[in-house]
């Protein structure tokens, strides 16, 4: 799984994030995926017989490891960094990188540190207070093979976390016959 980190982490790190409006993705098949307001994991689960999460890395990082725009979105704070691959029927569909401020990991949200291979979306979107904002998208691939990504800030009990998701080539976002 370290190959995912080597191959796809730079794509997220170097993504040119833009607002969905600036890329005119609304109304497109892939736009429906990128603009999904609820749990991406639940949506992906509907497209396969077996949905799994492979935990690549989880560690605490210092605020100096955050980019300037990440600090702007969640603050100049130390975080728990979580990297996973979401898989459908054994195929890698999404590489995801989550930054959870340590201050978010208090009270009811302390369990976020113990998710392991459980999808983050399954936990976050069961909470009635969950919401998403600051949604940005990027095309990190080529014209011949686009690799779309999205980044958004999630809130749970008014505590932030930042999720960046890269839709890999085999993801249903690119499949015309599996749109829903």
Swiss-Prot record:
Enzyme Commission code(s) on record:
4.1.3.40
Q: Which GO terms describe its molecular function?
A: chorismate lyase activity
Q: Which Gene Ontology CC terms are recorded?
A: cytosol
Record localization: Cytoplasm
Residues binding substrate are: 82, 120, 165
* A matching Pfam family: Chor_lyase
Q: Which reaction does it catalyse?
A: chorismate = 4-hydroxybenzoate + pyruvate
One Gene Ontology term of the biological-process aspect is: pyruvate biosynthetic process
Q: What does this protein do?
A: Removes the pyruvyl group from chorismate, with concomitant aromatization of the ring, to provide 4-hydroxybenzoate (4HB) for the ubiquinone pathway.
- This one is known as Probable chorismate pyruvate-lyase
Give the species. Answer: Photobacterium profundum (strain SS9)
As recorded in Swiss-Prot or TrEMBL, the protein's gene is named: ubiC
